[in-house]
Amino acid sequence: KKLKALALKSAQDFLALYDSVPDKNATAAPERKTFYGQVPRTANEMYEHTKNVNTYYFAEIAVEADHDGNIYECRKRGFESLESNPDFLQNTVRKGSYGEDWSLRKVLRRFIWHDRIHAKAMYRMAIKVFGAEHVANPFCF
């Protein structure tokens, strides 16, 4: 319950940070590519990337999810889908993509970790472009 509450609060905080950025398409970062592809540079790119991993993480534990609506709404629906399975608290370990083991606990931790790394990048970029006084800091960076 605590990890779920943290994962949902993390989504709310991410949305609050994103909503506070005055221009969602501004950036201070140069284009950069990794083996995963282009690195998100704008608040909008970071938000869409972070929101869209909901389907990936939930799929790793065989839960149907989507990324419609905002990050909080789609994460909440993912948890509702998860909790419709009577055995969801068994913390079953499943083989996911690339042979990696996944459990509910791991998915919860990963949501929090992933939100935080992209929130920090978004916050740093936004204060560089707009100044700290114009950007919310719900993660207390």
Residue ranges and their predicted role:
Residues K1-S20, A65-S97, W102-A121:
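Acidic/histidine-rich alpha-helical segments that form the ligand environment
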